[in-house]
Regions:
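Short, well-ordered amphipathic alpha-helical segments that serve as non-catalytic structural scaffolds
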Residues: 18-29, 62
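Beta/alpha (TIM)-barrel catalytic core signal, keyed to glycine-rich beta->alpha loops juxtaposed to Asp/Glu
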Residues: 45-207
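Active-site groove signature of glycoside hydrolases
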Residues: 27-50
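Residues in well-ordered alpha-helical elements
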Residues: 19, 35, 195-196
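Short loop/turn segments at strand-loop or loop-helix junctions that form parts
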Residues: 2-4, 42-43, 153
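Generic anion/oxyanion-binding catalytic loop in active/binding sites
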Residues: 10, 26-29, 187
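Beta-strand segments within the central parallel beta-sheet cores of soluble alpha/beta enzyme folds
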Residues: 1, 38-41, 77-78
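Active-site mouth loops of central-metabolism enzymes
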Residues: 3-22, 48-52, 160-169
Length: 207
């Protein structure tokens, strides 16, 4: 379950307000009819500066209190920025990282604007090797026991297109295999758009 999110004006939005975060979490428990959540995922932290502020403030105090009381079992964080994610992993405060992993995103350097991940301009120049910050992040998570849950394994479907940043269409199995073989990766949320993509995802188990 996400922490630091609210449903407002018909939209799912990020918040950094402790009172809103607590109210939203309590409402989620009521809706689910439960008294605990396995992972409390702090939503969308994409800069080292924001992580530092959050980790030293009341939101982290609240997350730690939830964990200590058993109302969440693990603290997680979602991010698109390897530098922010690495700072979180190395802090010892998080147990789980939700991070965008695929063969194309891994070529790009850290950026606080996640829109660069799916911008054509980002792939216009030569990109030959994995970004060292991303490589360092995966290795650190493996070493520190921080499990990675992958998002955007298919790049929102972009990697399956002939206009893929890879220069040709990749298959669902190729994208899943890439993500699942990165260090520390425990699971992948495929994010399918079609029944066919869902069937291909399920078929990976027997590929």
């Amino acid at each position: 379950a996400h922490l630091c999110t609210v449903w407002r004006d018909g939209q799912y939005k990020r918040t950094r307000d402790p009172a809103e975060t607590q109210e939203s979490f309590e409402e989620l428990l009521r809706r689910l009819g439960t008294d605990y959540i396995d992972i409390g995922m702090i939503h969308y932290v994409d800069s080292p500066k924001e992580w530092k502020s959050l980790s030293e403030g009341k939101l982290m105090e609240y997350a730690l209190k939830l964990k200590q009381s058993g109302r969440i079992r693990r603290i997680g964080l979602s991010s698109h920025n390897p530098l922010a994610a690495l700072a979180a992993a190395e802090s010892g405060l998080i147990d789980v990282l939700m991070f965008s992993v695929n063969p194309c995103y891994d070529l790009l350097p850290a950026n606080e604007d996640c829109e660069t991940l799916w911008s054509d301009d980002s792939y216009a120049g030569p990109l030959l090797n994995m970004d060292p910050d991303r490589e360092k992040l995966y290795e650190a998570c493996q070493r520190l026991g921080v499990g990675i849950t992958v998002m955007k394994a298919l790049g929102g479907g972009d990697l399956l297109s002939e206009q893929s940043p890879a220069g040709k269409a990749l298959t669902v199995s190729q994208c899943l295999h890439y993500a699942l073989t990165r260090p520390a990766v425990a699971s992948v949320m495929t994010g399918v758009h079609t029944i066919s993509q869902l069937e291909e995802s399920l078929a990976y188990e027997h590929a």
